[in-house]
Every structure is written in structure tokens, then in C-alpha cells.
From Swiss-Prot:
Functional description taken from the UniProt entry: Binds directly to 23S rRNA. Probably involved in E site tRNA release. Protein L1 is also a translational repressor protein, it controls the translation of its operon by binding to its mRNA.
Similarity annotation: Belongs to the universal ribosomal protein uL1 family.
Cellular component GO terms held in the UniProt record: large ribosomal subunit
A GO MF label: rRNA binding
The protein's assembly and partners: Part of the 50S ribosomal subunit.
The keyword Transcription regulation appears for this protein: no
PROSITE patterns assigned: RIBOSOMAL_L1 (PS01199)
UniProtKB keywords: Repressor, Ribonucleoprotein, Ribosomal protein, RNA-binding, rRNA-binding, Translation regulation, tRNA-binding
Stated name of the protein: Large ribosomal subunit protein uL1
InterPro entries: Ribosomal_uL1, Ribosomal_uL1-like, Ribosomal_uL1/biogenesis, Ribosomal_uL1_3-a/b-sand, Ribosomal_uL1_arc, Ribosomal_uL1_CS
HAMAP family, alphabetized: Ribosomal_uL1_A (MF_01318_A)
Pfam families: Ribosomal_L1
Source superkingdom: Archaea
Amino acid sequence: MADQEIENAVSRALEDAPERNFRETVDLAVNLRDLDLNDPSNRVDESVVLPAGTGQETTIVVFAEGETALRAEEVADDVLDEDELEELGGDDDAAKDLADDTDFFIAEKGLMQDIGRYLGTVLGPRGKMPEPLDPDDDVVEVIERMKNTVQLRSGERRTFHTRVGAEDMSAENIADNIDVILRRLHADLEKGPLNIDTVYVKTTMGPAMEVA
């Protein structure tokens, strides 16, 4: 269960958000400090499964063949085989569009080398190289897990953002999502919470409320 202060900040962000004619996301902004982000080992690059889900549609594309491809078609947004992967490698614009429109990629391990060859220069810089799928992994379970996953990625910037829910989720559920993210950062950063300057939560168009 999240700290009450986190839930209070979320409640204020939801209450103070102006009414819009679309469903807003709830986003978290994390400001880092005392880290040399020119050193890649100090950068944040984590996938976190949110206990209450993202509250949004998550686009997932799978690279697979045979039975795995057939099962993935039940739940993935798109499934591409080896031939389609090769075609994509020859169309830079299509590859970039796919990368920009997709939240997560999953791929059978046997295709990872070809993905690196054909799409590495497109997916790598975007932090979207596929999650490898072992032969005994259940592709449906992996996809369902990734639908509730967000990416924490700072790059060289001291401030990074990630979604933590949607405006029609409860403050308690959003706070639980934030709590999981902060715990992961505290565990992974060199000096834990001392490497976090400030944290804010806000809806898409609403005011930012300080969490920590």
C-alpha cells in the first residue's frame, strides 16, 4: 500500500485537473540529482509492471513463427514473421513508424539476431529492442504482463516522465503504481532516494503536484 502522502498528491492532481473532452492520462515526472548521466551505467532504463495497470491501451508487436505466432495473434496488436521482418528492414520509414507507434516489442529468441541486423538502429536508440521469448515462455502471459508495464528511461536528461494511470482510476490505485516505481528507483539508483530531487504527478493538461 502506498504512503498516504502519495495518495494525497494524486487526489489533488485529479481534483484540480480542468475538465477536458478526452480521457487524460496521469503522468509522473522524476527529477534526478547527483548523477553523471553521461555515464550510461548511471542512466535509468527499467521496465516496471504496475500493480493497478496503466489505465491505457498498450500497443504490443510480436516477432514470431509457427504456434507462437498463432497464439500471439489472440492478444497482440500485430504479429510479424521472419519474412515481414526482413521487408521492414528494407523500409526505413515503415520501421520508424512502427517503432513510434508501438509501446513494446516481443520476439522469439531465434529471431533476435535478425532483429538486431534489420531493426537495431531504429529500435535501439528508442529503447525498444524486443523482450526475448524463451521456448518455454507462454507468449500470451508475457503479452498480458507487458500490457501493465511502463518504461522508465532517463537517457542523458535529469528529468524523465512515465505514465502511472488514467484520470478515471482511483487515487489509491494510481498511488500504488507510483509507490512501485519509486521503490524500484530507490533500489536501483546508486544512492537510492538521495539521487531523486523531486517527483511530481499530474494529468495530461492539469497542474503538477509534488509527491516527493
